[in-house]
Amino acid sequence: RPLAIDKKFDFFNPKVGLNWNINSNHRIYASFSVAQKEPTRNNYTDGNPDSYPKAEKLLDYEAGYTFATHWLTAGANFYYMDYTDQLVLTGALNDIGEALTENVPDSYRMGIELMLGIKPCKWFQWDINATWSKNRIKNFVENIPIYDDDWNLLDVASVSHKSTRIAFSPDFLLNNRFAFTYQGFEASLQSQFVGKQYMTNAEVEAL
């Protein structure tokens, strides 16, 4: 839809962090950062015609530990991402097949990332990482359009949910990589496992 928008966004995005190298093998760290992002053009053109999209704000808290030797690396990273007006995928598409988004007032992503790398010899390395997370919208309100037999919009029904999973955000991810090197030749085998995820923010099973 045609738009005539003159919108200004002023952001202050600080970041602070602490890093402690306990010795040559052990390291711990922690950080806090603020990230804000303005809506894209598509958020305006494909959004609700009665209201403009809002800027997204993130408060990111992270802490972790790493261990490293000449043949082994391992680490754990804990994170909590607190969002205000996060722009999330709705599961719907526009007229040309692009994914639609909407603002949700209060949401979060939290979890732990585990990493392991092993290099037992010069020609082989194994890297694996896994993420367990909880990605939720607090007090999600689902707006359901109601049409007549000729697809004319009659009304919009609002359904309140307590806490729902964010669309396209699985609770578990696993990545695995085997890498081989020999006299300038390199090859790798990669695999990924993605846990259960939903195509809408209302956790609809039958889609």
Place the predicted regions along the sequence by residue.
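Gram-negative outer-membrane beta-barrel transporters
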Residues: 80-82, 102-203
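Signature of Gram-negative outer-membrane beta-barrel scaffolds
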Residues: 1-23, 38-39, 142
